[in-house]
């Protein structure tokens, strides 16, 4: 079992951002970079389970009605809060939401749907394709960049297009049998894995909720906002400073922004 301390995760944030080369996922990136470097000390190749949740229906938005039917990217929670942190001359929340809404409408219009599909099946197909084309692609890109930065090759067998094409056309009842997420994959692994692993509840990628990590990030943000940097030129200094000084910045730790 590998563990990463608050200081390790915070210290690697700049490196993770550099290797990601685009807006990323903070501690979700830096902790993965840390873990990949630890694995690389003993191994050059690893196998990862990325893509199984998107294909076999492991995320809550595949079975929670309020998420699967919300009419937007189901993993996004109030993006206007994040958009409001930009300076008005750089990006306005209204423009950002219009862009996201247009992207969502285009994404769902591209989902392959059969004439015989009922509303539940259509919603499930949309959740699958949104997850594969957006959520999964983001996680694969993150995995590639963090692992390669550690000189570790990570293979993703579930990303085989033949698996996606086959499972996509299976009914939801097969993939979500008896209300159990990824039930098809669990059944396929019977006899190959111990029962306590085979039937355990999904455990998401570990992200920190530590107050120590939060304190370190507050200090880093505070320092950056007081510099004459590009970061300070696109982010509203007053709003971010107010957030830093506030009691609740829990959304900084959310897996997907």
Region spans (language model):
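Short, hinge-like loop/turn segments at secondary-structure boundaries
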Residues: 16-20, 63-66
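Acceptor-substrate binding/catalytic loop of class I
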Residues: 22-26
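Short acidic/histidine-rich active-site segments
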Residues: 43-59, 149
């Amino acid at each position: 079992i590998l563990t990463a301390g608050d200081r390790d995760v915070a210290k690697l944030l700049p490196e993770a951002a550099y290797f990601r080369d685009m807006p990323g996922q903070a501690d979700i990136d830096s902790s993965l970079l840390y873990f990949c470097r630890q694995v690389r000390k003993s191994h050059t190749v690893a196998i990862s389970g990325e893509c199984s949740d998107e294909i076999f229906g492991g995320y809550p938005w595949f079975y929670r009605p309020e998420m699967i039917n919300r009419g937007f990217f189901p993993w996004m929670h109030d993006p206007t809060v994040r958009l409001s942190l930009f300076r008005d001359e750089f990006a306005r929340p209204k423009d950002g939401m219009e862009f996201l809404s247009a992207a969502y409408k285009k994404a769902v219009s591209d989902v392959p749907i059969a004439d015989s599909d009922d509303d539940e099946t259509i919603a499930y197909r949309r959740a699958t394709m949104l997850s594969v084309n957006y959520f999964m692609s983001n996680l694969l890109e993150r995995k590639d960049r963090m692992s390669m930065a550690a000189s570790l090759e990570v293979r993703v067998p579930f990303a085989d297009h033949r698996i996606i094409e086959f499972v996509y056309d299976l009914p939801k009842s097969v993939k979500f049998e008896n209300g159990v997420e990824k039930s098809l994959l669990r059944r396929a692994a019977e006899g190959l894995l111990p029962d306590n692993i085979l039937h355990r509840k999904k455990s998401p990628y570990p992200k920190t909720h530590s107050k120590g990590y939060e304190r370190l990030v507050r200090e880093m943000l505070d320092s950056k906002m007081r510099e004459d940097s590009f970061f300070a030129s696109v982010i509203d200094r007053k709003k971010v400073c107010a957030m830093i000084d506030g009691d609740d910045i829990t959304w900084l730790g959310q897996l997907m922004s």
